[in-house]
Every structure is written in C-alpha cells, then in structure tokens.
C-alpha cells in the first residue's frame, strides 16, 4: 500500500479490526520509510445488480432510491432514520445474497412494503399508494381492508 505521506510503496500492518458488522476491515498501517501511520479500509467488491424497470429498461441498483422512497413514506411518522436504514440494509443484503444479476423493481417494491408493514402501517399504505399507483379512494379502502383482515387473523 502506497504511503499517503511520502509515496513509498511498502508498509506494514500494525492493527486489523472488523468494522461495520464484519463487512469492512479497518487496518492501521505504518510506512516502512517515513514511519508515519495511516488507516485503510477493505471491503468486498459487490458485483453490480441491474434493476428491471416497468418499461423493461435496466438500471444499476441504487440503495438511495429505496431510502428516498421510504423517507417520503415515513415523513412525519414515528419511524427513525436508523429503522429506515435498517430496512434498506436488509433489502440490499437479500438482493446481493440471492446471487442474482437482475431483479425487477416490482420485487424490490414488494420487499419494501413487507418490511414497512411490520414497522408502521401508515407508512406502508403511503408507500403502497405510490408504488401501486392507487387511482382513487376505493383502492385505498381495499388496501386498508386487507390490512385489517391480516390483523384479525
């Protein structure tokens, strides 16, 4: 690893620690020439996953799009940013662990709704109304009736 201070090509690892729930390795290094220490991070390079949109276009997976949709659905609701990030992390992990190269936006939307439903039903209905493109009040009522039926069972 090249030293950021003097540019020397060689360094030794002084300390290694897992971070970010084991997804990243933090290494303290020492330059063999100038003896200055610096930190590097190592993480697994993820293969790009393509999202198949409704019109069959393909876009690279972007976790920020999911997070932004969840933030809008949870606006003025008692859902913390930590909970929202956890939902996105879980979905991202499920997608990458599936070892698929492509996933439909429909599948991602269903995953988001499933997780939102467990945390906050109002946020779930808000997300569903945009995602499923509710046309009128009857569509809202149908979705609410489904929720009530699930709650009773």
From Swiss-Prot:
GO terms for biological process: negative regulation of DNA-templated transcription. A zinc finger (unnamed) spans 3-34. Residues 49-139 form the ATP-cone domain. The keyword Membrane does not apply. Disulfide bonds: none annotated. Its cofactor is Zn(2+). One of its GO terms (molecular function) is DNA binding. Binds 1 zinc ion. It comes from the Bacteria. Keywords: ATP-binding, DNA-binding, Metal-binding, Nucleotide-binding, Repressor, Transcription, Transcription regulation, Zinc, Zinc-finger. Negatively regulates transcription of bacterial ribonucleotide reductase nrd genes and operons by binding to NrdR-boxes. Belongs to the NrdR family. This is Transcriptional repressor NrdR. It comes from Caldicellulosiruptor bescii (strain ATCC BAA-1888 / DSM 6725 / KCTC 15123 / Z-1320). The lineage of its organism: Bacteria, Bacillati, Bacillota, Bacillota incertae sedis, Caldicellulosiruptorales. The gene is nrdR.
């Amino acid at each position: 690893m090249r030293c950021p201070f003097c540019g020397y090509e060689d360094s030794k690892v002084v300390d290694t620690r897992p971070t970010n729930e084991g997804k990243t390795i933090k290494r303290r290094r020492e330059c063999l020439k100038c003896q200055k220490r610096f930190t590097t991070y190592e993480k697994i390079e993820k293969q790009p996953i393509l999202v198949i949109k409704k019109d069959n276009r393909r876009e690279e997976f972007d976790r920020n799009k999911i997070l932004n949709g969840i933030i809008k659905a949870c606006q003025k609701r008692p859902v913390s940013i930590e909970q929202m990030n956890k939902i996105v992390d879980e979905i991202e992990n499920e997608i990458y662990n599936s070892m698929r190269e492509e996933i439909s936006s429909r599948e991602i939307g269903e995953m988001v709704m499933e997780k939102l439903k467990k945390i906050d039903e109002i946020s779930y209905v808000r997300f569903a109304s945009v995602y499923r493109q509710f046309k009128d009040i009857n569509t809202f009522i149908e979705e609410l009736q489904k929720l009530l039926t699930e709650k009773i069972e």
